[in-house]
UniProtKB/Swiss-Prot annotation:
It comes from the Eukaryota. Residues 18-57 are annotated as: LQLFLAK domain. GO terms for cellular component: extracellular region; host cell nucleus. Residues 58-139 are annotated as: DWL domain. A motif (HVLVXXP motif) lies at residues 140-146. Glycans are attached at residue 534. Residues 1-19 form the signal peptide. It comes from Phytophthora infestans (Potato late blight agent). Secreted effector that elicits necrosis in host plants, a characteristic of plant innate immunity. Pfam families: Crinkler (PF20147). The gene is CRN16. This is Crinkler effector protein 16.
Length: 618
């Protein structure tokens, strides 16, 4: 029997390499006792027999050049001629061990069954594994502590910390950037994918949010935006950046509290006292997702830097935003179609539908790629039906209240921003969303909708709806008929503009009729509309009178196929009327092809009382 000096390393703990002297005839259980005795503080709450021990073998290369763990096979004659070697202390894997990190090879070494305590070291080392004799400048034994087994020195005297065993958070130190991606070995909790796409906006926002020109003072930042746009994933990106920079970070996550002390990832079981200024200091970044930092028990937010990610809601952001120093607010942008195309291969189940969902629901990955069980038009219709008109034009902001309809209406209303992401606009998810809002509200809230035509100043959402409201309103006026102010349109070359006149449009003999297309022989004095929204020629027609275009802008062109349709409308039918609001009636000019006789008809805004609630216009 020979006394050997074994260099041991605790997997996942920085600076944990230490030596143990023991007789090689002793049992493995005695080695465990010796390891615990050598590091009593590290193994304070774990019994020696619970430790898992693995041999630190030097890797060999397989046929592809990849490093793999050598396996001793006594039946192979060539293996009896040469002993397996120990892991050199300058090998890449050994250096990572000393830093408290791990890699694929360390994972491979510790993936097998640990040796039984009843075996002798001689049997374990030489008989079963044919190892060479231990010497200096080597790592010999890897020590793995089972879950809940670590008792690490607390970072503060009163906080309770333990080594992190969550595989996702444990890997952050070893995750590298590959192109525009972070590649993980475990699934991200939110996306259930192993890759995180680094949007250019992530980098810009993080650069500004984490920059603190006032050394020694706390820094506050708020990142907000449309639900489902990726704010929580952005928090993981910020966590990765701070860890790579070896900064102290405390993450408030749904999976628990995670603390990185600059070298090791820990789980926080109890926060240190708010009086512990060594722990709570401006260099500590607290990352908070969807919680009001001022209401988190035990968090002295005035002593540390805080980044809060939240949807635009007063209960999460309002009180925190009041605290000095004033938080920098950033607005996470919607995803472009190109960005979504980059991550779409990770969601093969959405391959056939994501582009249509993007057109309908806007640049929100959760709705476009992840939660795709509901038809997008049905999703928008449900939101329109569940919300009042006031709900549908309320301006979202960080001061917005939260009620039962908040989440629903955010399917319709999004927040758009551009670099440097400090300002935002409230917009609708899509043209389809606006069409459906007007269509569903026209029957019961017609007066309110019509009131927007002349009094929507100050509310960009209401202004966005005006074009679609005008189409519905103009169609009703057409169906009713009557006398309208009008003028013939001429090219810009004509110096004199003809005077206004009046024209009588006959009342439709029946309510507007839906037709597949314009056809010869359709009834005179009957208003027809196309049955599909993608009918591109004209918006409506009346045989022996003419075709109609609902127009809310000066640049409206004549659609392809209009001339052919007008030719089928019979006597006096080959003419095109542009129905225009007061804003554009005077300045509207003749469009190409100019061979078509064209007229502008003034459709005045209705004179109705504005019934919108004041809150929607604030």
């Amino acid at each position: 029997m020979v006394v050997v000096s074994l260099q041991c390393a605790i997997v996942g703990q920085a600076g944990s390499s230490f030596d143990v002297e023991i007789d090689d005839g002793a049992k493995v259980s005695k080695l465990k006792d010796a390891i615990k005795a050598k590091k009593p503080n590290d193994f304070k709450v774990v019994d020696a027999d619970k430790l898992h021990l693995f041999l630190a073998k030097q890797p060999v290369e397989d046929e592809s050049g990849k490093e793999v763990v050598p396996v001793y096979r006594p039946s192979a004659e060539e293996m009896k001629e040469e002993n397996l070697k120990w892991l050199p202390d300058e090998h890449r894997a050994a250096l990572k061990l000393v830093e408290g990190e791990s890699d694929d090879y360390i994972h491979a070494l510790t993936a097998g069954e640990p040796i039984l305590g009843s075996k002798t070291l001689t049997t374990w080392f030489y008989t079963k594994n044919n190892m060479e004799l231990p010497s200096s400048e080597q790592i010999h034994v890897l020590v793995v502590v089972p879950e809940q087994g670590f008792s690490v020195p607390t970072v503060s005297q009163d906080g309770v910390f333990d080594h992190c065993i969550n595989p996702f958070f444990l890997q952050f130190r070893t995750v590298d950037k590959v192109g525009d991606w972070l590649e993980f070995s475990s699934l991200l909790p939110l996306t259930r994918r192993q890759k995180l796409y680094i949007r250019s906006s992530y980098q810009v926002i993080a650069n500004h949010a984490l920059f603190n020109p006032n050394v020694g003072m706390v820094k506050y930042a708020v990142v907000t935006g449309t639900p489902g746009v990726g704010k929580s994933v952005f928090v993981y990106y910020v966590l990765w950046r701070l860890i790579k920079e070896k900064k102290r970070v405390l993450l408030f996550d749904n999976n628990g509290l995670f603390y990185f002390d600059g070298s090791t990832m820990l789980i926080c079981l109890a926060l240190p006292s708010k009086f512990n200024e060594q722990f709570w200091s401006p260099d500590l970044w607290c990352l908070v997702d969807s919680m009001d930092p001022t209401s988190i028990p035990g968090l002295p937010y005035r002593l540390c830097s805080v980044l809060l990610a939240s949807t635009p809601r007063r209960d999460c952001i309002g009180e925190f935003k009041k605290q000095p120093p004033t938080a920098d607010v950033f607005y996470m942008p919607l995803w472009s179609k190109e960005e979504l195309a980059t991550i779409a291969p990770m969601y093969p189940h959405a391959a056939a539908v994501w582009e249509n969902r993007f057109d309908c629901l806007g640049g929100v990955p959760r709705l476009v790629l992840q939660d795709i069980g509901t038809n997008p038009q049905a999703l928008l219709m449900s939101a329109c039906s569940s919300c009042s008109l006031d709900d549908c034009i309320v301006l979202a902001s960080i001061h917005s209240g939260v009620n039962s309809k908040t989440t629903i209406v955010q399917t319709l209303i999004h927040i758009r921003s551009q670099e440097p992401y400090r300002e935002y606009k409230v917009v609708y998810a899509s043209d389809l969303a606006m069409q459906l809002i007007v269509r569903t509200k026209w029957q019961h809230d017609r007066a309110k909708l019509q009131s927007l035509l002349g009094s929507s100043d100050g509310n960009p959402l209401a202004q966005s709806l005006c074009g679609y409201i005008f189409e519905f309103y103009s169609m009703d006026r057409l169906e009713q008929g009557g006398t309208f102010v009008y003028r013939e349109l001429f090219s810009k070359k004509r110096k004199r503009t003809p005077a206004d006149g009046t024209i009588d449009i006959p009342r439709s003999s029946q309510p507007r009729q839906v037709a597949e297309r314009v056809e010869v022989g359709q009834h005179a004095k009957q208003l027809y509309v196309p049955g599909t929204s993608n009918y591109t020629a004209i918006d409506a027609w009346m045989p022996q009178f003419g075709g109609f275009q609902m127009t809310v802008g000066k640049t409206h062109d004549i659609k392809g196929g209009a001339a052919d349709d007008l030719a089928k409308l019979g006597q006096n039918g080959n003419r095109l009327f542009f129905l225009l609001p007061p804003l554009y009636y005077k300045t509207f000019t003749k469009k190409t092809p100019q061979t078509i006789k064209q007229y502008a008809i003034l459709v005045p805004y209705p004179e109705v009382r504005n019934e919108l609630s004041a809150s929607t216009l604030q």
